[in-house]
Amino acid sequence: MPLPKISEARELSDEKLSDEIVAIKRQLFQLRLQKATRQLEKPHQFRQARHRLAQLLTLETERKRAASQSAKEEK
């Protein structure tokens, strides 16, 4: 399975974006538990989850900066 594209994440609403971030963090936690108990079957999922989390956090930061920038311009 290829790594997800950030263009797919850009289509998400702010609420969906936050939900997705929480879901990915939970997934990473579960993967770490599986790794610790030696039950992890697909180690490539770590990379995919971290990559997706980085994309989503980057997008969230971009949106927050854009919102604060537009708020400054309105003053």
Swiss-Prot record:
State whether keyword Ribonucleoprotein applies.
yes
Q: Which GO terms describe its cellular component?
A: cytosolic large ribosomal subunit
Asked whether the keyword Ribonucleoprotein is assigned, the reply is yes
UniProt-listed InterPro entries: Ribosomal_protein_uL29, Ribosomal_uL29, Ribosomal_uL29_CS, Ribosomal_uL29_sf
Disulphide connectivity of cysteines = none
**Superkingdom, according to UniProt?**
Bacteria
Alphabetically, the GO molecular function entries are: structural constituent of ribosome
Entries under PROSITE patterns matching the protein: RIBOSOMAL_L29
Any GO BP: translation
User: Per UniProt, which keywords does this protein have?
Assistant: Ribonucleoprotein, Ribosomal protein
Q: Which family does it belong to?
A: Belongs to the universal ribosomal protein uL29 family.
NCBIfam families, from UniProt?
A: L29 (TIGR00012)
Name the record gives this protein: Large ribosomal subunit protein uL29
User: What organism does this protein naturally occur in?
Assistant: Nostoc punctiforme (strain ATCC 29133 / PCC 73102)
Q: What is the lineage of its organism?
A: Bacteria, Bacillati, Cyanobacteriota, Cyanophyceae, Nostocales
- What is the gene name? rpmC
